[in-house]
Amino acid sequence: MRILTGYLPATSGSVHLCGLPVATRPDEVKRRIGYLPENNPLPEDMRVSEYLYFRGRLKEVSRRQLGPRIDEVLEICDLKRVRHRIIGQLSKGYRQRVGIAEAILAEPPVIIMDEPTIGLDPHQILIVRDLIAGLRGRMTVIISSHILPEIEVTCDRVLIINQGRVVAQGTPAELRREIFGQSSYELEVAGDPSTVDAALATVDPDLRAAPLGETPAAGPEEFRRLRLTTARSDELGDAIVAALAAAGCRVRAIGREHPSLEDVFLAATRRSWDAVQATAPRPTPAR
């Protein structure tokens, strides 16, 4: 993140933000980004409005525009009630919102946030999550985080980096398809097994059913739990239920299984490690 924001030079490779090379034009890049570091060094003795005015002048926002802009970011970040409070007396959640207000103060086209919800309680996480979502359409927000459930509900596009290399990228749905390559459903159904298989084949000839857990021997009237897998990515739940009902089978429950972003991350990084090990030179045995 420090390389992206121009605070640390890269030893190899290159970074461009807003079409500008960070390495050779860092000052121009910094004017186009707002940055919320993981440990935001806020001044403990300044009031919220004083700090935003101070930062706004450093960002070269004109005095005429700065007052209305401070009012606007205080409204966006729900900070009006604490605008005259000393920053050192604020909770971590409020301090994080002050950091976001400072980052968006000069209306940069790009906002970079490093672990924006770490250390917050669940209520504060929801507030910050909604705040970030409210920036959508106004500016590009880049978030670095290891809290993958937050990334999944906040971000439109995900990049997974392992050992400095991008090993997967795309929307969460695209990553699931790329990494796992199939959709799966959990089904509870009662009916003759051959009838169930025939009904499923009418929905998708490649739909495969496997028993879930320890399924005891049961007659056609007993419910069985099955995992269905298919290469198709479209939603098949309604079609499966309709086909089974038409065949005289009884469905008690059906649900589509969605691998979490944590599952995707683990699979993608494991795949990249396997690729590295496969291409690594093997040591010559001693003679």
Which residues make up each language-model segment?
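ABC transporter nucleotide-binding domains
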Residues: 1-163, 167-168
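Short, surface-exposed acidic/glycine-rich loop or hinge patches that mediate macromolecular interfaces
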Residues: 20-23, 84, 166, 190, ...
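C-terminal coupling/interaction segments
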Residues: 232-287
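Non-catalytic alpha-helical coupling and interface elements of nucleotide-dependent molecular machines
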Residues: 57-60, 180, 184, 205, ...
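Short glycine-rich hinge loops at helix-strand junctions in the catalytic core
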Residues: 78, 204, 248
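ABC transporter nucleotide-binding domain
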Residues: 129-231
